[in-house]
């Protein structure tokens, strides 16, 4: 059970506590949630960044939460009830190699953090980091609940369980939320019914992270799959943009043409953004992103975004201000509240397969809905993936398992086999080996 005696003495350990993204979202959501309070221990390899978040956090909300930068994992984790992990494995310079070095071989990636050459190399960087985190949780906070936001989600979460089998960990991702919003807008357009919240769209979710699928969807007991079939056929060529979004104006937006195309092929609704979906299978998407109306996200954009967030950090500190007190749209705080006994929640999480996805390997990290209540996360039986999707997902699961094992055992040969087996690596073996070695060399130098 948890260490807490009352809901005003909660301890959250934040690994990656210098984050200017996920950590600030948590601060925002905690600042408007009046159900609980306590301490947030901020641990980061960049201690100065954690100290800055301490200052900003302590100016956020009405003082219910005390933020403290700490210098060691032990200090962060000791007596923690909840552990949050959101780190960048390596640096943006490393990610520049992940995403852009394969372009010399004609391999283009829209994100490069999950699969493809970039996802595999990033995974190899992440494995020893997550192994260390898992051991520290085992030693200092074995009863805590762990929420991981770091990509590659499946590999990172798998390593947590491999190193500490008794861990209570879930991986959380917001990609499904965007598909719920798409379905909500479809209901309004096609049926003339306003959907107040995307959560009101009930979905059966299954697959692996960033390659997740919806096989059932409903609103007020209305079956939405036949309606989506018409919707997809109508917008398959032109695309459909969510209200307030324009795919040309943001590297994170799309017109859902990839999702519509995959639905026409496999008969289930892809529940991730087009940028992620496109990387899981070979085909025309990454060769012609503008035709399919999504973007390849350059690392130059991420570096510019980081610079702007650093400026915002300094501004908040000088002005002695905290984060904006508004909901981030993430579900982390609601998950924490449910785990602490403050209600129940059904949402999508990544956990070892215990049979919740019938036709994917047991113990592989799969994404499905789960029922969350006090000190319990129960995956919901979600059935089987369509056969064609199963074949695609199984290949990536094999690669993810190989990357986790290769990283833990330092088996370069196994790592290369996973690299060569990725669907985006459609080049000669000799070229693939040279690319792999060059990317691996960059890891060793970083």
Curated annotation (Swiss-Prot):
Record: active site: 174 (proton donor)
SUPFAM superfamilies reported in the protein's UniProt record: LDH C-terminal domain-like (SSF56327), NAD(P)-binding Rossmann-fold domains (SSF51735)
List of residues binding NAD(+): 10-72
Keyword Manganese belongs to the record: yes
Cofactor note: Binds 1 Mn(2+) ion per subunit. Although a Mg(2+) ion is seen in the structure, galacturonidase activity was shown using manganese.
UniProt cofactor(s): NAD(+); Mn(2+)
Superkingdom per UniProt: Bacteria
Intrachain S-S bonds: none
Gene3D superfamilies assigned: AglA-like glucosidase
EC number in record: 3.2.1.67
Cross-referenced Pfam families: Glyco_hydro_4, Glyco_hydro_4C
Protein function: Alpha-galacturonidase able to catalyze the hydrolysis of the chromogenic substrate p-nitrophenyl-alpha-D-galacturonic acid (pNPalphaGalUA), and of the probable natural substrate alpha-1,4-di-galacturonate (GalUA(2)). Can neither hydrolyze pNPbetaGalUA, nor the stereoisomeric pNPalphaGlcUA. Does not display alpha- or beta-glucosidase activity as it fails to hydrolyze melibiose, raffinose, lactose and the chromogenic analogs, pNPalphaGal and pNPbetaGal.
The protein's assembly and partners: Homotetramer.
Name of the protein in question: Alpha-galacturonidase
Species this protein is from: Bacillus subtilis (strain 168)
